[in-house]
Amino acid sequence: MRTFQWELVIKIMKYDFDKIIDRSGTDDLKHGVLQQRYGDANLLPLWVADMDFETPQFITDALRKRLDHSLFGYTMMPENYWKHIAQWIEEHHQWRPREEWMTYIPGIVKGIGMAINVFVKEDEKVIIQPPVYHPFRLTPQGNHRQVVYNPLIETPSTEGQGGRASYSMDFDQLAEVCDSKCRMLILSNPHNPAGICWDADTLRRLAHFCHERGIIVVSDEIHCDMALFGNRHTPFASVSEEAAQCSITFGAPSKTFNIAGIVSSYAIVPNDSMRRRFYTWLEANELNEPHIFSPIATLAAFTPEGEEWRKEMLQYIEGNINYVIDYCRNNIPQIKPWRPQASFLVWLDCRALGLNHQQLVDLFVKQAHLALNDGEMFGKGGEGFMRLNIAAPRNVLTEALERLRWSWHHE
């Protein structure tokens, strides 16, 4: 029944997510560094977090219209730009940030690095919650700040969770490792790689803990518009006044609309003194000025047409997730995909295969000829996992899973 229903949905979709896009000649990262990263340029890449779907035409049309003008001098931010973004956030997440709280940043990882340099001295510390997006560790370390680890607790699959394994925050351990040198906590919300939409109670508790201790929470919310299966994203700064006053939120349309190469990120800082300190630094270094195409792409995305595309894309993503879960259950039951609540990234629990780290990587890379992110790069708790990007046409996923099935059964 599920297959029939999904086929029916595909037939009535306006947009074609089954279309194969040839990315050769575009210098795309997903294919371009396979030899350097994996030692094989001919792998099927399902690793870096951009989509293999065509960027929607209403965005490319807006960019072409500006290109037709043929003069690309200095530009200013379009009128009502921040009002437009604030309205989108309010419509989707029931929280409206004030326009004066917002500014452009040249990428979220860059924004994290900038915030670290502004607010954390070199002898101070940054807390992260592994397994988590690896730049949360690399960026503080690269800026000569000590990283403090507050590992998430795995919560096994239960009926109460709809059969979904997940993670929870360990507040007891957080209290143990947090000392007076801890100045910042980097939060992944929704969580990457496990796709968790953190609930308001958890975020409120985290906000209270950090606010009491003068810790700034940097909340990476880049996957916020990709909540799945009826789940909802909760902006960290929305859960309490304490959360608002101790937080820096980063967001962008790049994941949702597949425009990562057009850097359209933004920051939201409700606290007046924090905002003055951070935004003055950004302005002094001219890091709050977007390139000419960023506002154009964002304004084209955050429209009723963009909302229609987003909803269809999420339907397709949900179908891909169901397909991966069903395929593994029926063909490779030792691999247990965690059903994400948000994003197009699926956390594959491969521990039942009984392989060590190198054997697991070799199974995917050398035998199945697939490029995924291995779990160890996400830190403690990621051992035995692989991160799969399922934002691809169904035929591509089928090919990948068939390769994996054949490789495992012929091990």
Regions found by a protein language model. Name each.
Residues 11, 175, 243, 354, ...:
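PLP-dependent enzyme catalytic core of the Aspartate aminotransferase-like
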